[in-house]
Amino acid sequence: MADIHEVVTRSLNINEKLGPRLKAAAEQNAILRIGWTNAGDPVPKNGELGLCPALPEGARLRALGVLGSWVAAFGQGGSFTIQGDAGSFLGAANLGTTVVCEQMAGHFTGYAMADGSITVLDGTGDDAGAAMRGGILVIRGASGARIGGGMEGGLIVVHGDVGPDPGAGMSGGRIVINGRCPPPAPGVLLRPLEADEVKEINATLDDESLHVPSDAVCLMAQEKLHFEHGGFVVSSGDLSQIGLINEENPPLRTYQTVDTVALIGTRDEVKSLALPVPLLANLVSGSTMSPDGNTPADVTSILNRHPALVEAEPRAVDVMLIGQSNLLDVASWLPDAGGFAVDLDELPPMNAEQLDGLLVALRSVASTNVPVVLIQGISRIQALHARAAYHGVDVAMARIEDGSGLSEAAALPMMGRSKKEHLQGTMTQAGLLLGFAASGHDLAVLMASGVDLVACVAPTADGEDIAYWLQGTQDDLAHHLRRIGLSSVDLLDRKHLRALDQETAAVSGLRLAGYGRPLPHWFAR
């Protein structure tokens, strides 16, 4: 078996070579082939992943061999046929591509698809059609557990047996099963097909070998009361009870220049993003940071040089935050972004191979060598840092508001221990995603604790107000650096921090102001 890093490199190279050929082949109505030599001799692929993302209209591809995860994801049109097996997330976030897998497909086939069709001719793994919003998924052969889980629309047809918990959490769409079906999940209705439905479905399938018989059953969501989730438990504090001191250096002059610049991505091959202050504003849309003709020149200058973490319409300096809610927009928006962040909490749990497949697909859609960020809850920071280092991403960012209720002060020693264990000696930076708008003091405290980059919600949705907040935060950070006698944010260290009360000292392990040492329980074995 080839080394996984070799597989990733091969996969990226295949996508890079295919890119310029797709448009020309579509204009000539030609089929591009993967797994054959130029002379037509078969050379089956073995494990290549993330292949052929965001296929455009008119593209026609055929692949031979056993492929990995996230193949033909984010499709916009055209067709993709696999003569062999496919891994997990085949055709995920499909918006119009016709995908055919002539043998078996893995878990999460058709995940979050909204249009197009996917046909698998020898069964699938678990969670086929999960989070599906539209389109058609046809499976011949057995399918695993939770088929159609969380689906909102579309049609799934299974000619074979399905596993336990079919339709779990579905709120729309139909699952037609021509085979054995266990009792459906709560809130799901199992009923026979009506004659008109059989005709309508078979007309939609347009393939006699896949037509459903009249004795097939249909699963649909039942009407039920909708309970609006109240959201995560928020953290129990902020960073106001942590002070900044320097017992060694005198203060700098009030007019002395200090360095507050930070980079996203420190590898030589990465197109790093420069931040005037180590802070990314977390916004819904990059258009919020796009000045118009009436915006003052100084505000325009601030907005243009500050990257942001956005879910939609990224600018060339922005990092696009990718989760289930905007997977369908990846092909449209990601090429314009200066980097991307994968929200692991918003996507299904993935093993190393599946995450590699997603990263290959996204890197192939994005601009060349942009920085990559992984985001996950603070309670899973050890796993996050280990995965980030293994996959060679640029930033591992822990989200404070993950439902655990852990405070920012309690997160600091967790961050420090995990960074030392997993990120030391790597080029992966440690980040923190806050649930409140950070100040310059907050940034100084976090930088001194070993955090390289902070993202947080903006205090306002108005672009001009955001510009004033960003400039004020930079000035506040510079003021604290001058006050404690440091010329650069890179010189901040844990020795500059003091807990201002016992509760903060107890959970953070910082020296208690006045006592001069951490509380005794931090030394207990």
Task: Annotate each predicted stretch with a short phrase.
Residues 1-245:
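Long, distal/terminal scaffolding or interaction modules
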Residues 2-60, 209-337, 476, 487, ...:
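N-terminal capping/small domains of soluble enzymes
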Residues 59-61, 79-80, 98-99, 117-119, ...:
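Structural motif
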Residues 85, 104, 142, 304-434, ...:
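Alpha/beta enzyme core
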